[in-house]
């Protein structure tokens, strides 16, 4: 047993998990359950009453958090301590949205001042582009921006831009490219005019394979349309810490925005990586996005555990994963603009907490990061919700919905809300055999057939969910929501005693991918690797099966 599983608070939860009544009973015996098990902060309302939890459960979960020194770990992150111990780095994405008068020192430098300088530079750049002052090589204004990145430098900007579609200023179109598949960039470039297109290349090293390959292809396309190397500076900018490589490529040093080691890619949308967002929604709205996230930072850092929204959500996820063997967690967004959030939270959580050793290198003997997946309501109700209701696996769910729509057409939004709330009720309540049979009594079916169908219509219920509401989707509430999930991810990693801020599995994939690439482009037959890899490489070289 590891240190964590030996804790009395952990073992108390193990024992307690076997004695909880069905949620139906909890609701029937606790008339004030909704009021007692809901909270609000930072423009968000969280109903966590539809969880397998009593007041005793909550006390035991908070005891585990306290025994795991969660509060001191939260303070250590905000203070800039080196909590990413494998890479010897501070973890300070929170500094990206801190107010200008805040002082956070890393290696003797106030990084908040650096962040503010970068935000000012971003503002000037956004203004020059959206006002039409920035001209392309033929004197035309820029109409289209192509953002090239991968991982956090792609997914965050894309999903946030999509979510904030109602706030686009309309001056620019933005296109996102990540996959190294040539089809991706080829399709994006179709219909674009090189005279009015600007590329934003995001790579800390300016050498990430997929990003560099796509950027080189974009440059070849640009030059093939009649532009010259000297024109590159008017159509390419970079977010990178490798200034020399970027300038060698042809990018003006003044148009290179910084990245810092104390920000991981999946936490970087708040930095200059978010430049495409700012270009679409304007700098004022981008600052509102940061302000919403900062408000959640303050809540997380200063609120007691018992009413701390990220702590509550993180502890529930751990509760189901470690004590009920839940292997996945579903995120269901009842707002079309938020349809990309499940994929964003998937990267955030799975890249952070997909770990199997503790900070000190001990193998864990408990489950860590679950599979995060999901989609858009109500589409999922006609697909995978069936598994949620009657499948054998326990899959906790998060339902996310604004109370007011940006597009209040007819009865659409009230129907959307009825589906959202109805699903949470059905998951909690289920349907007993007697209830199913009673519904069939007027069907005219033979008794034997009624008994059979009733068995198939039984739903166990007791399926947990959280419901997160906001008045309306705005830059501020979106910032709060994303920061909520960032900190929820931190809470789980802190309890599990793992490093949520490295990604050695990703790094190994890059390394082996480069090794395979060398063999794919070599003239000789591949023989050095395992028989499967050799066989696949040689089939690719043949170009046929």
UniProtKB/Swiss-Prot annotation:
HAMAP family: G6P_isomerase (MF_00473). This is Glucose-6-phosphate isomerase. It is found in: Cytoplasm. Coiled coil: none annotated. GO terms for cellular component: cytosol. Keywords: Cytoplasm, Gluconeogenesis, Glycolysis, Isomerase. One of its GO terms (molecular function) is carbohydrate derivative binding. It comes from Shewanella pealeana (strain ATCC 700345 / ANG-SQ1). It catalyses: alpha-D-glucose 6-phosphate = beta-D-fructose 6-phosphate. Pathway: Carbohydrate biosynthesis; gluconeogenesis; Carbohydrate degradation; glycolysis; D-glyceraldehyde 3-phosphate and glycerone phosphate from D-glucose: step 2/4. Its main location: cytoplasm. The active site is at 351 (proton donor), 382, 510. Catalyzes the reversible isomerization of glucose-6-phosphate to fructose-6-phosphate.
